[in-house]
Amino acid sequence: MSEPASISSGIAARYAAAVFELAKDEGALPALEKDMDALGAAWAESADLRDLATSPVYAREDQQKAIAAIAAKMGLSSLTSNTLALMGSKRRLFVLPQMVADVQNRIATEKGEITAEVTAAAPLSPEQAARLAATLKARAGKDVKLKTTVDESLIGGLVVKLGSSMIDTSVKARLAALQNAMKEVG
């Protein structure tokens, strides 16, 4: 890991640990989870939010006012709003995506959940997602939350990352394996 990334993840981990522990002590983990999901979605969808958080062009006061307005508009809890205000005052909003991911991981661990990253060639139906989650739950022994993405280059099948293991049943991987086998023979 590069040094700047390591520093960023360290900063994010400190904020994540603090907000998680405060929410846990207050019994507000469900609200925090909802806030983190909303912030993660907003970060992914809004180039303006990413620009606000990462651009050095904005003054500290402008960042603070903007993030407070965003938090109010999104209806975030006071704990999350105050955390964002503190991050803005310290010019630490650039670690927001890492902090969100860290908090989500802490909440999942607290709930006995594990997140599986699933990449499919086509969107999964609710029935397929439920069957996959049940199968992965049997394998992992924990509740499984699916984080799905679509990659049409897989042609068909799935790539599932669960913890440190990866299961690749995609047509793309099978074709690559077949191509390698043919190279060895010929």
UniProtKB/Swiss-Prot annotation:
It comes from the Bacteria. InterPro entries: ATP_synth_OSCP/delta_N_sf, ATPase_OSCP/d_CS, ATPase_OSCP/dsu. Keywords: ATP synthesis, Cell inner membrane, Cell membrane, CF(1), Hydrogen ion transport, Ion transport, Membrane, Transport. Pfam families: OSCP. GO terms for cellular component: plasma membrane; proton-transporting ATP synthase complex. It is a peripheral membrane protein. Its main location: membrane. It is found in: Cell inner membrane. One of its GO terms (molecular function) is proton-transporting ATP synthase activity, rotational mechanism. Belongs to the ATPase delta chain family. F(1)F(0) ATP synthase produces ATP from ADP in the presence of a proton or sodium gradient. F-type ATPases consist of two structural domains, F(1) containing the extramembraneous catalytic core and F(0) containing the membrane proton channel, linked together by a central stalk and a peripheral stalk. During catalysis, ATP synthesis in the catalytic domain of F(1) is coupled via a rotary mechanism of the central stalk subunits to proton translocation. F-type ATPases have 2 components, F(1) - the catalytic core - and F(0) - the membrane proton channel. F(1) has five subunits: alpha(3), beta(3), gamma(1), delta(1), epsilon(1). CF(0) has four main subunits: a(1), b(1), b'(1) and c(10-14). The alpha and beta chains form an alternating ring which encloses part of the gamma chain. F(1) is attached to F(0) by a central stalk formed by the gamma and epsilon chains, while a peripheral stalk is formed by the delta, b and b' chains. This is ATP synthase subunit delta.
